């Protein structure tokens, strides 16, 4: 006679400090990424993030060259000027990427031929968490929705992830219907 025991791993509920909008937004954003990559089996596209890291590495290298260049100060002015100028250019490129390309997008993901972007906004002192799911190739196909964060956190600050994932499921089904109509 054999006995089979199943062990279930229960995740510790996520606690946040109520009225800390940054922590609340980060918790909700992380949950969206978890839902899209786990439940919907999308693969997260990190190309833009890797590009930003590469530019940051180049900027740090320029700063190190400017600091540790072997020739003393008065003679190394052209090198310092070049390093500072290139650092400014790299900073402007990173700023451009953040403001005009990445915008409020927290996730870019793909599955077979389907590519999506998810943007979120939680304004300070506003209880409504806004999510926009859109097709990465055709931004006119999008599903925006806004819900109060009170639905996803109890009075002690415990994150009610299943409630949030249920709402996400409904929105992603709407998005899938719109996406199929367009194809």
Curated annotation (Swiss-Prot):
GO terms for biological process: protein targeting to ER; signal peptide processing. The chain crosses the membrane at residues 53-73, 81-101. GO terms for cellular component: signal peptidase complex. Signal peptide: none annotated. The keyword Transmembrane helix applies. Keywords: Endoplasmic reticulum, Membrane, Transmembrane, Transmembrane helix. InterPro entries: Spc2/SPCS2. Residues 74-80 are lumenal. Residues 1-52, 102-183 are cytoplasmic. Component of the signal peptidase complex (SPC) which catalyzes the cleavage of N-terminal signal sequences from nascent proteins as they are translocated into the lumen of the endoplasmic reticulum. Enhances the enzymatic activity of SPC and facilitates the interactions between different components of the translocation site. Component of the signal peptidase complex (SPC) composed of a catalytic subunit sec11 and three accessory subunits spcs1, spcs2 and spcs3. The complex induces a local thinning of the ER membrane which is used to measure the length of the signal peptide (SP) h-region of protein substrates. This ensures the selectivity of the complex towards h-regions shorter than 18-20 amino acids. Belongs to the SPCS2 family. This is Signal peptidase complex subunit 2. It comes from Dictyostelium discoideum (Social amoeba). The gene is spcs2.
């Amino acid at each position: 006679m054999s006995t089979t025991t199943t062990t279930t791993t229960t995740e510790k509920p996520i606690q946040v400090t109520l009225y800390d909008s940054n922590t609340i937004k980060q918790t909700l954003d992380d949950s969206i990424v978890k839902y899209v990559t786990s439940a919907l089996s999308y693969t997260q596209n990190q190309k833009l993030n890797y590009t930003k890291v590469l530019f940051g590495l180049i900027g740090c290298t320029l700063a190190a060259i400017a600091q540790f260049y072997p020739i003393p100060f008065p003679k190394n002015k052209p090198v310092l000027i070049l390093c500072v100028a290139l650092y400014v250019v790299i900073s402007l490129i990173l700023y451009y990427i953040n403001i005009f390309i990445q915008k409020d997008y927290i996730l870019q993901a793909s599955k077979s031929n389907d590519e999506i972007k998810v943007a979120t906004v939680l304004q300070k002192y506003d209880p409504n968490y806004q999510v926009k799911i859109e097709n990465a190739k055709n931004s006119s196909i999008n599903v925006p929705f806004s819900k109060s964060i009170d639905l996803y956190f109890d009075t002690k600050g415990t994150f009610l992830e299943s409630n949030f994932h249920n709402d996400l499921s409904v929105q992603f089904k709407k998005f899938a219907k719109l996406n199929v109509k367009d194809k």
